[in-house]
Swiss-Prot record:
PROSITE patterns: SUI1. It comes from the Archaea. SUPFAM superfamilies: eIF1-like. This is Protein translation factor SUI1 homolog. It holds the Pfam family SUI1. The keyword Lipoprotein does not apply. GO terms for molecular function: mRNA binding; translation initiation factor activity. The keyword Protein biosynthesis applies.
Amino acid sequence: MSSGMCPVCGLPKELCICEEVAKEQQRITVKVNRRRYGKEVTVVEGFDASEIDLHELSTYLKSKFACGGTVKGNTVELQGNHLARMKEVLMEKGFSAEQIKN
């Protein structure tokens, strides 16, 4: 298929709603882990990597929270404790409040 077409539904990228439908079906968990030397890492998990572009989401979250981070498997890890604002920011990105669990 051409690069302007969605590989899932076959519609042009401008008309594709596959990612929005995928967002509605996911259960997202947000938690804070302590790593070496007492550093805190916010872990956001529960994404379906085949439906959501995790690297694009990671870039968006890193710019919103002004921190570093990475994508590991189906999780996004951000440096620091961002538990308080994470639900609000994910809702801005199109996820519903019922899907997000702290």
